[in-house]
Every structure is written in structure tokens, then in C-alpha cells.
Amino acid sequence: MFYRRKFYIVRNEFVEEFNKHFNKTNLPNQLSHGSRLVGRWMTAHDEHTTEFFAIWEYDSYEDYVEIENKIVADTVHVNKIKAWYEAHGGREYVLSNYILQVKNEKLIDTVTPTT
């Protein structure tokens, strides 16, 4: 199995919009291409921001790469993402003013021995 963690720091005034976008746009698209969501959580980061993270599961790293390639090739989805950014001032504006940090990280299993 391959697991990844998607991590964000988001300004509090954008939390509702960010959650709506995930549930309405990103989650259905990820699932339709074969991603499996283990869970998604949020917690206060400081008085102005909220931390989000999601854990995703794949059968292998190769499956993850294949699924991600399908997602970025999905022009309908890509256009929805572009339109969402534009509705909020453009991608650069959103990433400078609302979504302050993004990480996409491989997780390493510490319970099951690797062979």
C-alpha cells in the first residue's frame, strides 16, 4: 500500500469555502479516478489559520502516479478548478492570501515491517 498526506494551512475566513470546494469538486473527482480517502481533518493552527490534512490510500506508488495523471488530464475537472480560483481572485491571489501552505507527502508505515 501507498499512503499520502495532503496538508494545508488556510486562513480562517476561507475555511467554509475551502471545505465546500473539497466536498463538491475535489473529493468526487479523486474518488472517480480511484483514489481512496482514509479521512480528512482540520484543527486550529493559530488564531488566524486552520490546518487541514487528508490521508489517501493507494494500492501502490505506481497506482498513485497513474491516478494523478488521470486527474490532471481530466479537462472538465481542470476547468472547474481554474474557474474556482478565478472566482476567488485567481490562483496566485488564493495561494498568497487564503491557502498559505500546501504539502503533498508520502507516509511511511511504521507498524507493518517492510520487506
Language model regions located:
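Surface-exposed interaction/gating patches
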Residues: 1-17, 36, 106-115
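Short, solvent-exposed loop/turn elements at beta->coil junctions and helix N-caps
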Residues: 41-44
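Short, structured motif recognition centered on aromatic/hydrophobic residues
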Residues: 2-7, 18, 30, 51-56
